[in-house]
Each structure stands twice: as C-alpha cells, then as structure tokens.
Amino acid sequence: MKRALHIGPLVFRDPVLLCGVLYVLLWFDASGFLRLGLCAAFLHEWGHILVYWAMFRTFPTIEVTLTGFCMRTRGRSMTPQQTFWLAAAGPLTNVLMAALWAVRLEQEATIRGSAFWAANLLTGAFNLLPIPPLDGAQMALALREALRQRNQGLQFLRKSGKIKRMKKR
C-alpha cells in the first residue's frame, strides 16, 4: 500500500522510503555530483511550474516520488499550443541554465561548474526524447494535435467555399 503526504500542492509518494533513500544517496555523494543533478532536475521542474503559473495563475499539484518530480495537470483543459509550451518549458530552462553556465565557465572553469553545465544539458536532452511520459512525447503529441486541428479548419473552409484548393503548376 502506497502512502502519500499532502502539503499544499505537493504530494509526496511513500515519503519515508523517499527520505531514507535520498538521505543515503546524499550521504555517499562525496563529490557533490548527485546534488548538481538534483539541482538541474529541480530547475527543470521549476520551468514547468513557472509557465503553468503564467498560463493559469495557480500552482499545479506536484508529485514527488523516488523517480523524480512530476506535475499533475489532469482536469485542466489546455490547447495544443499551451501543452507544447508547458512541456517545452523544462528543457528550455535547462538549456538556458547551460548557456548561462557556459558563459560563466569561460571566465573560470571548475569541475563542479562543468558538471552543473553537463547536468543541465543531459537533463534537458533526456527529457526531449519522444518517449512517454517525457516532455518530448508531450511536445510531439501537442504538435500533432495542432496540425490535426489546422487541417480540420482548412477542410471546413474549403467545404464552405471560403477558400479554394490551389492548383498545381
């Protein structure tokens, strides 16, 4: 039986196991690279949250599990364009952070700085894979739906006589 702890819009799935595993992993993370990866993942999700807030002026429900964070948008009606930009916000945040960090690395290159840069690039690139439930799959589905709606609109306009099919030369 899975337990959940609700704190405002945050939902922690199986919080005792989550905290225990996180504690052990951070205990053995002498290099600090896990912390940098977690920071990149947090920034990624924060990008989604900011765009969601900008669209709807409310915060989404955020589920925290052993596999990471995820935003629940069930019950929220969104256009394909909104869905696309909401999904793209996380990877764009990671790319923006990597670009800012690259400028910083030109001035003073450090191992941790390079690791943070790489963590952001890898987090953004991984989430662009078109595999559900990753952002790339959400973006592809939203793009497909937008094209389908556009084609339906064009077909309606052709049938109603508002526009005519162009002849090939």
Q: What are the residue ranges of the model-derived segments?
A:
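Hydrophobic transmembrane alpha-helices and their immediate loop junctions
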Residues: 1-169
